[in-house]
């Protein structure tokens, strides 16, 4: 099968984890991507990760490099740069089960974060970059003695073009999504 379209894309990430206090972790992440000669309808990067009211599988491609707190599929570009700082705070780290029930609570942790980044076509300026602040609550359990299941619930506020307040959730490696009702989110944040 031949094609008249020929383009290349590359993406990469740099991650650094610094242990703080007992088991707290400060995480620094830089992510970048570039698509060379891609036609406009094949631009791979979008600024947002979640679409309100939609559930989908956990992203494992370019979507995983997107920012939280921004509308998904509003704008695409052929260049991407995102910096993330997370502080991972363990709230409970204790294996707890009940008698012989095959369900084990492993740990619970809180992750406040800040993200700064942009996608663009051609040239950009530092003033075009967007940022977001949010927090996630993570839970890990073991079911059936050997299946680890991670879940998370988060809230984030994006600032800049296409920024919005999002409440999102996920079961790691299975699915994730965002709440649809804007009034529920506003009431939860501002009351």
Report the location of each language-model feature.
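C-terminal outer-membrane beta-barrel translocator/porin domains of Gram-negative envelope proteins
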Residues: 1-104, 120, 178-191
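Outer-membrane beta-barrel "beta-signal"
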Residues: 134-135, 164-191
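Residue-level signature of outer-membrane beta-barrel architecture
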Residues: 16-18, 87-89, 139-141, 157, ...
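Outer-membrane beta-barrel transmembrane domain signature
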Residues: 23, 109-112, 116-133, 142
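Membrane-embedded beta-strand positions of outer-membrane beta-barrel proteins
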Residues: 14, 28-32, 85, 110-114, ...
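Short beta-alpha connecting loops at secondary-structure transitions
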Residues: 66-68, 150-158, 165-167
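Membrane-interface anchoring segments and C-terminal beta-barrel signals
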Residues: 127-150, 157-162
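Flexible, surface-exposed loop regions and adjacent strand-edge segments
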Residues: 43-51, 128-130, 168-172
């Amino acid at each position: 099968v031949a094609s008249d379209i020929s383009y290349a894309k590359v993406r990469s990430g740099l991650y650094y984890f610094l242990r703080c206090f007992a088991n707290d972790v400060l995480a620094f992440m830089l992510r970048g991507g570039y698509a060379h000669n891609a036609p406009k309808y094949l631009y791979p990067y979008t600024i947002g990760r979640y679409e309100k009211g939609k559930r989908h599988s956990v992203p494992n491609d370019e979507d995983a490099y997107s920012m939280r707190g921004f509308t998904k599929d509003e704008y695409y570009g052929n260049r991407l740069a995102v910096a993330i700082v997370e502080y991972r705070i363990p709230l409970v780290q204790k294996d707890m089960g009940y008698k012989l029930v095959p369900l084990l609570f492993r740990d619970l942790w809180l992750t406040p974060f800040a993200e700064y980044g942009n996608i663009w076509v051609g040239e950009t300026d530092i003033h075009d970059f967007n940022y977001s602040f949010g927090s996630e609550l993570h839970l890990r359990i073991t079911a059936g003695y050997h299946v680890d299941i991670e879940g998370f619930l988060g809230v984030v506020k994006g600032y800049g073009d296409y920024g919005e307040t999002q409440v999102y959730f996920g079961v790691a490696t299975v699915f994730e999504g965002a709440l649809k009702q804007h009034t529920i989110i506003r009431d939860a944040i501002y009351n």
